[in-house]
Amino acid sequence: YIKGEVVLILDSDDYLTDDAIETVEKEWPLYRNCADICGMSYFRGKKDGSHLSVANAQDVYIDDDIHYRVNQKIKGDRCEVVRTVLLKKYPFPVYQGERFFPEGWFWNTLAMNYKTVYRNKTIYICEYLEGGLTKSGRALRMKCPLGMMDDCRMYLDNRVCIRRRVKEMLLYWVYA
């Protein structure tokens, strides 16, 4: 079903900037032959021009998601472009009766073996809707305990800072 070398997940009510595809087509070839790179991560922005992402110190920064985003507590939503082969290799778990699974699980799974190229460029525009996943996240997560326990387990790796590991251990017991 996915035919391209890389894929980007776009919510139905969001859109890409006019130069998004051109940007990816221009920048991805710089990293396509780097076996340790899983993809690229760009800014998400709002219609008013503000960012939902935190800028990197450099315009291009390469690191794994656990070290960069989790341990350094880098907040904000980003637009990830990932190798299609990896999206197929690591499918999201499905739990009967559960309708939500955190996307972060996938990025943490990739971070165990791959790095990401982080860019200070907006290519994705979104607005958070009332009643959407971001606004109703906690209630939704509580209705999906098996998936959330699976997600918490991802953070128990020794590469994750101790403070975050303790937090995820406690959350694991909440969902259990």
What residues fall within each predicted segment?
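Glycine-rich, basic loop-to-helix element that forms the pyrophosphate-binding segment
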Residues: Y1-K3
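Short aromatic/hydrophobic "clamp" motif used to bind/position activated sugar donors
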Residues: V7
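The conserved acidic donor/metal-binding loop of glycosyltransferases
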Residues: D11-Y15
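Alpha-helical elements of Rossmann-like donor-binding domains used by nucleotide-donor carbohydrate transfer enzymes
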Residues: D19, T23-E27, W105, T109, ...
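Conserved donor NDP-sugar-binding/catalytic core segment of glycosyltransferases
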Residues: D19-V54
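Secondary-structure boundary motif
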Residues: K26-C34, K89, M112, D157
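Conserved nucleotide-sugar donor-binding catalytic segment
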Residues: K46, S50-S136
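C-terminal subregions of glycosyltransferases and related glycan-biosynthesis enzymes
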Residues: V117-A176
